[in-house]
Amino acid sequence: MLRFALAISLLATSAMADGFTFTIGNSVAAQEAPFKSAAFVFRTERCAEPAKSQITATAEGIVHGARRSVPLKVSALQRPGVYAVFQTWGNEGRWVVVLKGVCQNETAGAIVPIGPKGFIRESSKFFPRPAAGTEVDASLKTMVEGDSK
Protein backbone atom coordinates (compact mmCIF):
# COMPACT_ATOMS: atom_id res chain seq x y z
CA MET A 1 0.00 0.00 0.00
CA LEU A 2 2.85 2.37 0.82
CA ARG A 3 4.43 1.72 -2.60
CA PHE A 4 1.13 2.47 -4.32
CA ALA A 5 0.71 5.75 -2.41
CA LEU A 6 4.30 6.72 -3.22
CA ALA A 7 3.79 5.93 -6.92
CA ILE A 8 0.60 8.03 -7.05
CA SER A 9 2.38 10.88 -5.27
CA LEU A 10 5.27 10.80 -7.77
CA LEU A 11 2.87 10.75 -10.72
CA ALA A 12 0.97 13.73 -9.36
CA THR A 13 4.20 15.64 -8.79
CA SER A 14 5.48 14.99 -12.32
CA ALA A 15 2.12 15.95 -13.81
CA MET A 16 2.16 19.27 -11.95
CA ALA A 17 5.74 19.90 -13.10
CA ASP A 18 4.66 19.66 -16.74
CA GLY A 19 3.60 23.20 -17.49
CA PHE A 20 3.30 25.49 -20.46
CA THR A 21 5.72 24.58 -23.26
CA PHE A 22 6.19 24.46 -27.04
CA THR A 23 6.20 21.66 -29.61
CA ILE A 24 7.94 22.32 -32.93
CA GLY A 25 7.30 20.75 -36.33
CA ASN A 26 7.84 21.00 -40.05
CA SER A 27 5.92 23.72 -41.83
CA VAL A 28 3.93 21.17 -43.85
CA ALA A 29 2.38 20.10 -40.55
CA ALA A 30 0.55 23.43 -40.54
CA GLN A 31 -1.77 22.15 -43.28
CA GLU A 32 -2.40 25.76 -44.29
CA ALA A 33 -1.02 26.81 -47.68
CA PRO A 34 0.30 30.27 -46.69
CA PHE A 35 2.47 28.72 -43.96
CA LYS A 36 4.07 25.82 -45.85
CA SER A 37 7.10 27.98 -46.71
CA ALA A 38 7.78 28.82 -43.04
CA ALA A 39 11.09 27.83 -41.44
CA PHE A 40 9.05 25.83 -38.91
CA VAL A 41 5.75 25.85 -37.06
CA PHE A 42 5.13 25.36 -33.37
CA ARG A 43 2.24 25.06 -31.00
CA THR A 44 1.73 25.88 -27.38
CA GLU A 45 1.10 22.97 -25.03
CA ARG A 46 -0.72 23.02 -21.69
CA CYS A 47 -2.02 26.56 -22.07
CA ALA A 48 -5.61 26.93 -20.86
CA GLU A 49 -6.31 29.82 -23.27
CA PRO A 50 -3.92 29.40 -26.23
CA ALA A 51 -5.48 32.28 -28.17
CA LYS A 52 -4.40 34.63 -25.38
CA SER A 53 -0.80 33.43 -25.15
CA GLN A 54 1.87 36.03 -25.92
CA ILE A 55 4.72 34.77 -28.09
CA THR A 56 7.89 36.47 -29.30
CA ALA A 57 10.77 35.16 -31.41
CA THR A 58 14.25 36.37 -32.23
CA ALA A 59 16.85 34.94 -34.59
CA GLU A 60 20.27 35.00 -32.94
CA GLY A 61 23.26 34.32 -35.14
CA ILE A 62 26.95 34.54 -35.77
CA VAL A 63 27.86 35.83 -39.24
CA HIS A 64 31.54 36.20 -40.20
CA GLY A 65 32.43 36.11 -36.50
CA ALA A 66 29.99 38.90 -35.52
CA ARG A 67 26.88 38.39 -33.41
CA ARG A 68 23.55 39.33 -35.03
CA SER A 69 20.03 39.61 -33.62
CA VAL A 70 16.90 39.81 -35.78
CA PRO A 71 13.42 40.26 -34.24
CA LEU A 72 10.98 37.89 -35.93
CA LYS A 73 7.29 38.09 -36.68
CA VAL A 74 5.38 35.15 -35.24
CA SER A 75 2.40 34.39 -37.49
CA ALA A 76 -0.68 32.86 -35.90
CA LEU A 77 -2.39 30.07 -37.80
CA GLN A 78 -6.15 29.54 -37.78
CA ARG A 79 -6.00 27.04 -34.94
CA PRO A 80 -5.43 28.85 -31.60
CA GLY A 81 -1.99 28.27 -30.14
CA VAL A 82 -0.34 27.31 -33.45
CA TYR A 83 2.25 29.65 -34.99
CA ALA A 84 4.72 29.87 -37.87
CA VAL A 85 8.17 31.45 -38.02
CA PHE A 86 9.41 32.57 -41.44
CA GLN A 87 13.10 32.96 -42.22
CA THR A 88 13.88 36.67 -42.40
CA TRP A 89 17.49 36.30 -41.26
CA GLY A 90 20.26 35.83 -43.83
CA ASN A 91 21.55 32.58 -45.30
CA GLU A 92 25.12 33.17 -44.11
CA GLY A 93 26.38 32.20 -40.68
CA ARG A 94 24.88 30.00 -37.99
CA TRP A 95 21.51 30.78 -36.43
CA VAL A 96 19.14 29.77 -33.66
CA VAL A 97 15.58 30.97 -33.16
CA VAL A 98 14.75 31.88 -29.57
CA LEU A 99 11.07 31.53 -28.62
CA LYS A 100 9.55 33.11 -25.53
CA GLY A 101 5.96 32.61 -24.46
CA VAL A 102 3.62 33.66 -21.70
CA CYS A 103 0.34 31.91 -20.93
CA GLN A 104 -1.49 33.34 -17.96
CA ASN A 105 1.09 33.17 -15.15
CA GLU A 106 3.39 30.61 -16.82
CA THR A 107 6.34 31.15 -19.13
CA ALA A 108 8.13 28.95 -21.63
CA GLY A 109 11.21 29.27 -23.76
CA ALA A 110 12.95 27.40 -26.53
CA ILE A 111 16.14 27.51 -28.57
CA VAL A 112 15.67 26.08 -32.06
CA PRO A 113 18.92 25.66 -34.04
CA ILE A 114 18.69 26.29 -37.78
CA GLY A 115 20.92 24.25 -40.09
CA PRO A 116 21.45 24.35 -43.86
CA LYS A 117 18.40 22.11 -44.36
CA GLY A 118 16.10 23.79 -41.83
CA PHE A 119 15.44 23.58 -38.11
CA ILE A 120 17.24 20.89 -36.14
CA ARG A 121 14.63 19.22 -33.95
CA GLU A 122 16.99 16.92 -32.04
CA SER A 123 19.20 19.84 -30.95
CA SER A 124 16.28 22.06 -29.89
CA LYS A 125 16.04 22.91 -26.20
CA PHE A 126 12.89 23.69 -24.23
CA PHE A 127 12.63 25.50 -20.92
CA PRO A 128 9.92 26.32 -18.32
CA ARG A 129 11.21 29.92 -18.52
CA PRO A 130 12.77 32.20 -21.13
CA ALA A 131 16.12 30.92 -22.40
CA ALA A 132 19.08 32.62 -20.74
CA GLY A 133 21.58 34.51 -22.86
CA THR A 134 24.30 32.07 -21.81
CA GLU A 135 22.18 29.17 -23.12
CA VAL A 136 21.72 30.93 -26.46
CA ASP A 137 25.47 31.63 -26.62
CA ALA A 138 26.24 27.99 -25.85
CA SER A 139 23.91 26.76 -28.61
CA LEU A 140 25.52 29.09 -31.14
CA LYS A 141 29.00 28.06 -30.00
CA THR A 142 28.10 24.38 -30.45
CA MET A 143 26.90 25.07 -34.00
CA VAL A 144 30.03 27.06 -34.93
CA GLU A 145 32.33 24.43 -33.40
CA GLY A 146 30.44 21.74 -35.31
CA ASP A 147 31.37 23.52 -38.54
CA SER A 148 35.07 23.32 -37.73
CA LYS A 149 35.08 19.55 -37.11
Protein language model regions, located:
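Sec-dependent signal peptide recognition
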Residues: 1-7
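Phosphate/nucleotide-binding beta-alpha loop and adjacent structural elements of enzyme active sites
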Residues: 10
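Sec/Tat signal peptide C-region and signal peptidase I cleavage site
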Residues: 13-17
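N-terminal soluble domains immediately following signal/targeting peptides that reside
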Residues: 18-149
